[in-house]
Design a protein with these regions (language model features):
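Short conserved segment of the HATPase_c
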Residues: 161-174
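Conserved catalytic submotifs in the C-terminal HATPase_c
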Residues: 78, 103-112
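A residue-level detector for a conserved hydrophobic packing site
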Residues: 121-125
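Short beta-strand/loop element within the Bergerat-fold HATPase_c
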Residues: 139-149
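Short helix-loop "hinge" at the ATP-lid/N-box region of the Bergerat-fold HATPase_c
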Residues: 131-133
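Conserved micro-motifs of the catalytic ATP-binding
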Residues: 71-75, 113-116
């Protein structure tokens, strides 16, 4: 069983290494083109920057994936004001939502206390918001409320493309072409779900046709 798991992991790493190699090759090509040019090629430099950013994101996802599979992520719970943490976490993304033309409605019930690892929460929250910015359009909503059976953090958004297989979105390396401009490594929601589980929570996905 252990050998089979190792083979599966090696195959997964090979797949994402291929995904990393492609944008890196593109970036390298444009870099060489710019060096040969007698003047600064702004468009080429922009493409270099975009592809190197893609490489950086996929390497980060791969490292996070390895830490999860090796059981290296252990939560350090502390009592805190979860409402404040959520507001603090969303504020840095405000300008990005404006740039994307997405109106974000924030409804956070104040003074919700809980035990939480803020660092792990920041990582999974970044994955969720990045997903909204990448695949969303027009409108999005973030709500935090406390009910009798637990604390509920909900993020909803309109999507650029219809979702075909909702039940597979958290599957390792599965991705759908939900963005008009960006592709995906297929690790974002897989990592997010497992980080939520590390925090002893549950992740639920839902989709409604417009």
């Amino acid at each position: 069983v252990a050998l089979q798991e190792k083979k599966t992991m090696d195959m997964d790493i090979s797949n994402i290494a291929h995904d990393i190699r492609t944008p890196l090759t593109v970036a390298s090509g444009y870099a060489q083109q710019s060096l040969r040019s007698s003047r600064e090629d702004d468009m080429a430099m922009e493409k270099i920057s975009k592809n190197l950013l893609t490489v950086s994101k996929r390497l980060e996802a791969l490292l996070e994936y390895r830490r999860l599979t090796e059981g290296a992520i252990q939560p350090q719970f502390q009592d805190l004001d979860f409402s404040q943490l959520v507001v603090k976490s969303i504020l840095p993304y405000y300008d990005m939502f404006q740039e994307k033309g997405i109106t974000l409605d924030i409804q956070v019930t104040p003074d919700i206390q809980c035990e939480m690892d803020p660092d792990i929460f920041e990582r999974l929250f970044q994955n969720i918001i990045s997903n909204v910015l990448k695949h969303g359009k027009t409108q999005a909503q973030l709500t935090l409320q406390k009910k009798d059976d637990g604390i509920y953090l909900s993020v909803s958004n309109m999507v650029q493309q219809p979702i075909q297989h909702l039940d597979q979105l958290t599957t390792r390396f599965y991705s759908e072409n939900l963005s008009d401009t960006e592709d995906s490594s297929g690790l974002g929601l897989y990592i997010t779900e497992h980080l939520v589980q590390v925090l002893e929570g549950e992740l639920h996905l839902a989709y409604e046709n417009e």
